[in-house]
């Protein structure tokens, strides 16, 4: 059966000088109803949500909160190295004077000591200074490289064999195993290997969380729901300075504490989450998809019509292998994912780089990280509001520009003679860095939501996972630049600033998706966008 034509936004995948009239989308989609035998009719999942369940109700909010809790552990696992791999303060034994990290290299081992026990961080325990200073960047770099590879594996599993929910469960359990194992590392090389494994296994959390949360809400609320999920990432980030301060004498205990949280979530809370009805439908499990939709409707105080069926998005059922092959053979999809990944590389590089670079500011590490974490809250609020009133493309690009310019200003404020000339330079640098981090956080979060809307259901998790791979590839380069920043903070901020501006420029060639429908298959989306482009060319 062929669905009747839907009204789609008149947008074209070109640089942003082409205006678009979003008011056309506000007229709503024409209801598509397919008459079936026995007086039954079929709707798409989008239509069932909009017409019978509600675009956003108690059920969707509760479900989004439930699956988004896992972002807490993702943040803790990702950013723990800010504290576990930091270089602690040292002092001269003769005078008790504080010694800068670079100055230790000219001293004999008996002339100085770490302030506090050697178990504070991996740097003090294994003496990763001077000729070994770049070794401290290896574990974090391998963590993000592991996340890069893991994202591809989890994306395939979530779109094919396991679905979103089981993949999230698997990722949480394996995150616990590897994080707990890290606390027993005997040397930096075992530590680095286990960080790689930890990054690999935790990489399924983020993509599954955002897809599970957004696939059951109406198109008007997709951006906001995707953004609100990042509140939990912020909570995880904000919890780190407190936990790190309480366990500041043992980086091993810090790892043990954060390791048990994802296990508790996987056992106690995740079983109550629903699998995505869109994924169930694409896999031919129509009855299970209807069961989930009925539960959502019931929680919203509504009931689905007894004669309702779901439109099969794949009349001739393909297996996942053919869907993956079609993804890489579909020209518009490949072009789009390349641009998304290019923007994601710069965004991930800057977002994680600013956080890891906190120790290179002229400020207290715990306070700096806490300020950065607090800036995530206005970033989410502002991003959520702007997603409701602005197009995705300019929102991402402008946020990237702001983050880039803030980093460049931080570079100027890092010059020693500027710090000496301006008495409030340290506070000003912290404020500018916080604004830059807020902007980079907004860009990072918006790009997640943007990617969800750019691709259809049968490859959506794969696309989001590829974006995460780009994020992680960018993030894997950040620790090396942070290590360089210990010698030249100005240089690290300059590189972060340029990368952020470039990622914003790349995004200008992405298609706008605000208020556009979510399609189920590549063929369905390609056909709709082709008709849309032809219409624009005619008009």
UniProtKB/Swiss-Prot annotation:
Q: Where does ATP bind?
A: 213-220
Q: Where is the composition biased (Basic and acidic residues)?
A: 1-10
Q: What happens when the gene is disrupted?
A: Reduced sensitivity to carnitine and high degree of root branching.
Report keywords, A-Z: ATP-binding, Cell membrane, Developmental protein, Ion transport, Membrane, Nucleotide-binding, Transmembrane, Transmembrane helix, Transport
Q: Which residues lie on this side of the membrane: Extracellular?
A: 74-133, 194-195, 246-256, 358-368, 416-434, 485-489
Tissue expression notes: Expressed in vascular tissues and at sites of lateral root formation. Mostly present in floral buds, flowers and immature siliques.
Q: Where is the chain membrane-spanning?
A: 53-73, 134-154, 173-193, 196-218, 225-245, 257-277, 337-357, 369-389, 395-415, 435-455, 464-484, 490-510
Swiss-Prot/TrEMBL GO biological process terms: cadaverine transport; leaf senescence; monoatomic ion transport
Which GO molecular function annotation, any one, does this entry have? Answer: ATP binding
List the ranges whose topology is Cytoplasmic: 1-52, 155-172, 219-224, 278-336, 390-394, 456-463, 511-539
Where found in the cell? Answer: Cell membrane
Q: Name one GO cellular component term.
A: plasma membrane
Q: Name the segments for region: Disordered.
A: 1-35
Its record classes its membrane topology as: Multi-pass membrane protein
Induction or repression: Accumulates in embryo upon imbibition.
Q: Which SUPFAM superfamilies match?
A: MFS general substrate transporter (SSF103473)
What job does the chain carry out? High affinity carnitine transporter involved in the active cellular uptake of carnitine. Also transports organic cations. Regulates lateral root development.
Family, according to the entry, reads as follows: Belongs to the major facilitator (TC 2.A.1) superfamily. Organic cation transporter (TC 2.A.1.19) family.
Name of this protein: Organic cation/carnitine transporter 1
Q: What is the lineage of its organism?
A: Eukaryota, Viridiplantae, Streptophyta, Embryophyta, Tracheophyta
- List the gene name: OCT1
């Amino acid at each position: 059966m062929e669905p009747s034509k839907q009204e789609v936004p008149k947008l074209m995948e070109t640089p942003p000088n082409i205006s678009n009239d979003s008011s056309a989308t506000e007229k709503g989609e024409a209801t598509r109803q397919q008459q079936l035998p026995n007086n039954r009719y079929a709707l798409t999942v989008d239509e069932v949500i909009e017409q019978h369940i509600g675009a956003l109700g108690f059920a969707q909010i509760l479900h989004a909160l439930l699956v988004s809790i896992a972002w807490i552990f993702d943040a803790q696992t990702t950013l723990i190295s800010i504290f576990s791999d930091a270089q602690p303060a040292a002092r001269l034994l003769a005078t008790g004077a504080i010694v800068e990290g670079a100055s230790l290299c000219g001293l004999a081992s008996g002339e100085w000591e770490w302030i506090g026990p050697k178990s504070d961080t991996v740097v003090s325990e294994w003496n990763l200074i001077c000729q070994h200073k770049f070794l401290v960047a290896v574990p974090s770099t391998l963590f993000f490289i592991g996340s890069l590879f893991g994202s591809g594996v989890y994306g395939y599993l979530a779109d094919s064999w396991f679905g979103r929910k089981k993949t999230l469960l698997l990722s949480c359990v394996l995150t616990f195993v590897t994080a707990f194992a890290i606390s027993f590392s005997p040397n930096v090389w075992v530590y680095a290997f286990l960080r790689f494994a930890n990054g690999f296994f935790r990489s399924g959390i983020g993509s599954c969380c955002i897809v599970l949360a957004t696939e059951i809400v109406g198109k008007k609320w997709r951006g906001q729901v995707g953004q609100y999920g990042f509140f939990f990432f912020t909570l995880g980030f904000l919890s780190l300075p407190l936990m790190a301060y309480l366990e500041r004498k043992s980086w091993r205990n810090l790892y043990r504490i954060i390791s048990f949280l994802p296990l508790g979530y996987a056992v106690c809370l995740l079983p109550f989450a629903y699998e995505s009805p869109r994924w169930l439908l694409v896999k031919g499990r129509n009855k299970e998809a209807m069961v989930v939709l009925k539960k959502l409707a019931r929680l919203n105080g509504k009931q689905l019509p007894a004669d309702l069926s779901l439109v099969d998005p794949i009349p001739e059922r393909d297996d996942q292998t053919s869907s993956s092959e079609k993804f890489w053979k579909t020209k518009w999809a490949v072009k789009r994912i390349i641009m998304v990944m290019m923007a994601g590389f710069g965004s991930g590089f800057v977002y994680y780089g600013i956080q890891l670079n906190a120790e290179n500011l002229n400020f207290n590490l715990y306070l700096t990280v806490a300020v950065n974490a607090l800036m995530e809250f206005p970033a989410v609020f502002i991003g959520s509001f702007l997603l409701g009133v602005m197009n995705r493309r300019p929102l991402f690009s402008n946020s990237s520009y702001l983050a880039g310019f803030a980093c460049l200003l931080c570079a100027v404020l890092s010059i020693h003679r500027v710090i000496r000339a301006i008495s409030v330079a340290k506070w000003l640098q912290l404020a500018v860095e916080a604004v830059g981090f807020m902007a980079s956080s907004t860009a990072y979060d918006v790009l997640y939501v943007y990617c969800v809307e750019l691709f259809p259901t049968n490859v959506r998790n794969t696309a989001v996972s590829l974006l995460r791979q780009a994020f992680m590839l960018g993030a894997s380069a950040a620790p090396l630049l942070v290590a360089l920043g210990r010698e030249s903070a100005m240089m690290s901020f300059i590189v972060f600033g340029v990368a952020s501006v470039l990622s914003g420029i790349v995004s200008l060639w992405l298609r706008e998706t605000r208020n556009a429908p979510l399609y189920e298959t590549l063929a369905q989306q390609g056909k709709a966008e082709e008709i849309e482009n032809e219409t624009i060319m005619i008009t």
